[in-house]
A protein has these predicted regions:
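Short aromatic/hydrophobic "clamp" motif used to bind/position activated sugar donors
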Residues: 104
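A conserved hydrophobic helix/loop-capping motif in glycosyltransferases and polysaccharide synthases
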Residues: 3-8
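Active-site-proximal specificity loops/subdomain of glycosyltransferases
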Residues: 50-95
């Protein structure tokens, strides 16, 4: 299962709790976490990698800091001041993630998972 989060440094702690809650209730599932990263530090990335790998799962980071400027250049009149890039990135994840990723479940960083997500993912 491919799970996507969009986060900045300030939400890493919340995202970590969400990731652990998801793993704890889906231990038998093959999980790959795709993190759309708006300036998450290398130190935080390393901590998250160690945590996720400790459970035998995968995690990949995709820097998205450049997206806002690209959007302004591509969409005339786009008022990007009203949205954070982590909000817009979830709409563009199809062009950010590798082509081999054909299905994902997007979760907000403050989501706590209390049971298996397999039925939801299989919809």
């Amino acid at each position: 299962m491919n799970i996507v989060y969009a986060s900045d440094e300030g939400y890493c702690q919340h995202m970590a709790v969400s990731i652990v809650s998801l793993i704890e209730h889906n231990k038998s599932e093959q999980l790959t976490f795709h993190i759309l990263s708006d300036g998450i530090s290398i130190e935080k990335e390393d901590q998250l990698r160690a945590m996720v790998r400790g459970y035998g799962k995968k995690i990949v980071f995709y820097p998205i800091e450049h997206l806002m400027e690209e959007l302004r250049g591509q969409i005339y009149g786009l008022d990007t001041g009203r949205f954070r890039i982590t909000t817009l990135a979830r709409l563009l994840m199809g062009s950010i993630l590798p082509r081999m990723v054909t299905k994902v479940l997007y979760l907000d960083c403050d989501t706590v998972v209390l049971r298996s997500i397999a039925p939801l993912y299989r919809l």
